[in-house]
Amino acid sequence: MFTVPILIGSLFAMIAAAIHVVIFVLESFRWNLPQTWRIFGIRSQEDANRTEFLAYNQGFYNLFLAIGAALGALFHFENTVAAFTLTLFACSSMVLAAVVLVTASPSSLRPALIQGVPPLAAVISTVVGILAIP
């Protein structure tokens, strides 16, 4: 079943997925570059080297969430139950991760908003769309 809010939710889920793929690339493959570690508040190359394995692992978490959100968005037109489940799980996880980020580090509000607002919009739009299905 298809509704306009579901289409909007799919769009926001794809935006959230794209953001998380970029984060994956930065954390898993570009972590030791000064322009990358500065984005994440790392103060020195030594600190970047020390935290590289953590960032690598975290990057893959972001990739897996991105895959879930993207597949959910793409499947909305094929298998709605699976699509809704994937979208709501992946995007809710992204939103909760953003909440954890800002509660653990209040100075990280901007990154939390970047990673959390699109999936929140996806969750809200998808739920509204589900409720609109007759």
Model-derived features: where do they sit?
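Core segments of transmembrane alpha-helices
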Residues: 58-70, 118-119
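Interfacial helix-start motif at the membrane-water boundary
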Residues: 46-64
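Transmembrane helix-loop-helix
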Residues: 71-117
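N-terminal signal-anchor transmembrane alpha helix
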Residues: 7-29
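Membrane-interface helix-boundary signature
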Residues: 2-12, 48-51, 80-87, 108-111
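Juxtamembrane boundary at the C-terminal end of a transmembrane helix
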Residues: 124-134
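Cytosolic, membrane-interface loops and tails of multi-pass inner-membrane proteins
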Residues: 28-51
